[in-house]
Curated annotation (Swiss-Prot):
The active site is at H18, D111. One of its GO terms (molecular function) is UDP-glucosyltransferase activity. SUPFAM superfamilies: UDP-Glycosyltransferase/glycogen phosphorylase. It comes from Arabidopsis thaliana (Mouse-ear cress). Pfam families: UDPGT. Possesses quercetin 7-O-glucosyltransferase and 4'-O-glucosyltransferase activities in vitro. Also active in vitro on benzoates and benzoate derivatives. Has low affinity for the tryptophan precursor anthranilate. Catalyzes the formation of anthranilate glucose ester. Is a minor source of this activity in the plant. Keywords: Glycosyltransferase, Transferase. It catalyses: a 7-O-hydroxy-flavonol + UDP-alpha-D-glucose = a flavonol 7-O-beta-D-glucoside + UDP + H(+). Its EC number is 2.4.1.237. This is Flavonol 7-O-beta-glucosyltransferase UGT74F1. PANTHER family: FLAVONOL 7-O-BETA-GLUCOSYLTRANSFERASE UGT74F1 (PTHR11926:SF896), GLUCOSYL/GLUCURONOSYL TRANSFERASES (PTHR11926).
Length: 449
């Protein structure tokens, strides 16, 4: 077996939005001469489509729910406790298994939601780095909440003027979110003991917030974790995420349809892999977009919330409703005029990296803060105003926001700004760019001496 510069074990939290960015980082490490092993829970491993040609090794671990995964757990706290118990044992087994090989594990890169992985790394004498899948701004807000025992006072010094509606929802948790709130705060219990703190962002995008975070921990921004062939093109084999939890059948239909649409004419609507909208909100969206050409991704689990008979009324020549779409291919298609998004960090980074203006409709977690930055800091979109009491975005507000981005007074400026962020994303990943320098610094510290 070929001797590598080192061997990184990557341990993501078991959901698609966390698995994908760490896997992409593994590809960067592999391109620098590192062996990388990516762990997946048994349940996730059995439900995804893996690219067999990928250079990234896979190892399975247990979360205690091998047959049913997260949804079969009795509660969030129960799942997290069992994941810690079973996960730490099975990760330790993988480390031991490689100890006597030519490429023993030298570093663990673990999801920041799993601080127990750092304790494990220290037990084995390995280097370790938490991987934060949210922006520097959100991480800094969460850190402030942690050191202030879960509370925040507005305004927050050194950050843009924030209102309550701009904060991550877990910072102002309701009863149902308390377990997630605790998980967010626990990211910071031992992160100061890690060798590095990795953040899926890039220097120019999060410049000020990165500086704030660097005062409390050794931050390295290593994003965007978008496949290389869409940006810097240094890794020729990296043209997709190469694993997916969803059906891939509709990809060709989607891209063929887009190729026939005029440039900048289509509104792309997608709310990620987890967001659950109410029937009322779905009806408002359906009504708001009726005068536009659109591609709307409605997951199978959400389809029943569409207005009765809606799918039969869709003009197939002008619009398309699908259960899944190849998002990178869609966003990079010239037909797309704007991206109506829930503002999950991965989707936000894809929109920025591919230069697409956005209509922001945040739902929960870090999304409200991402929406704030989309509109007021990066100036690449408009946040749809929601009703204060119900939280519903009404059709008039949705339609107005789409028009603002597609053809409004500031439309040209938003498109130019989106192009600027795309150029800076490419620059950061290219040789000598900020992300490339940071990844080189990381590998120089963890390689076998």
């Amino acid at each position: 077996m070929e001797k590598m510069r080192g061997h990184v074990l990557a341990v993501p939290f078991p959901s698609q939005g966390h698995i994908t960015p760490i896997r992409q980082f593994c590809k960067r490490l592999h391109s620098k001469g590192f062996k990388t092993t990516h762990t997946l829970t048994t349940f996730i491993f059995n439900t995804i489509h893996l690219d067999p040609s990928s250079p990234i090794s896979i190892a399975t671990i247990s979360d205690g729910y091998d047959q049913g995964g997260f949804s079969s757990a009795g509660s969030v706290p129960e799942y997290l406790q069992n994941f810690k118990t079973f996960g730490s044992k099975t990760v330790a087994d993988i480390i031991r298994k490689h100890q006597s090989t030519d490429n023993p594990i030298t570093c663990i890169v673990y999801d920041s939601f799993m601080p127990w992985a750092l304790d494990l790394a220290m037990d084995f004498g390995l280097a370790a780095a938490p991987f934060f899948t949210q922006s520097c701004a959100v991480n800094y807000i969460n850190y402030l909440s942690y050191i202030n025992n879960g509370s925040l006072t507005l305004p927050i010094k050194d950050l843009p003027l924030l209102e309550l509606q701009d904060l991550p929802t877990f910072v102002t948790p309701t009863g149902s979110h308390l377990a997630y709130f605790e998980m967010v705060l626990q990211q910071f219990t031992n992160f100061d003991k890690a060798d590095f703190v990795l953040v899926n962002s890039f220097h120019d995008l999060d410049l000020h917030e990165e500086e704030l975070l660097s005062k409390v921990c050794p931050v390295l921004t290593i994003g965007p974790t978008v496949p290389s062939m869409y940006l810097d093109q240094q890794i020729k084999s990296d043209n997709d995420y190469d694993l997916n939890l969803f059906d891939l059948k509709e990809a060709a239909l989607c891209t063929d349809w887009l190729d026939k649409r005029p440039e900048g004419s289509v509104v792309y609507i997608a709310f990620g892999s987890m967001a659950k909208l109410s029937s009322e909100q779905m009806e408002e969206i359906a009504s708001a977009i009726s005068n536009f050409s659109y591609l709307w991704v409605v997951r199978a689990s959400e389809e029943s919330k569409l207005p009765p008979g809606f799918l039969e009324t869709v003009d197939k020549d002008k619009s398309l409703v699908l259960k899944w779409s190849p998002q990178l291919q869609v966003l990079s298609n010239k037909a797309i005029g704007c991206f109506m998004t829930h503002c999950g960090w991965n989707s936000t980074m894809e929109g920025l990296s591919l230069g697409v203006p956005m209509v922001a409709m945040p739902q929960w977690t870090d999304q409200p803060m991402n929406a704030k930055y989309i509109q007021d800091v990066w100036k690449v979109g408009v946040r749809v105003k929601a009703e204060k009491e119900s939280g519903i975005c009404k059709r008039e507000e949705i339609e107005f926001s789409i028009k603002e981005v597609m053809e409004g007074e500031k439309s040209k400026e938003m498109k130019e700004n989106a192009g600027k962020w795309r150029d800076l994303a490419v620059k950061s990943l290219s040789e000598g760019g900020s992300t490339d320098i940071n990844i080189n610094e990381f590998v120089s510290k963890i390689q076998i001496k």
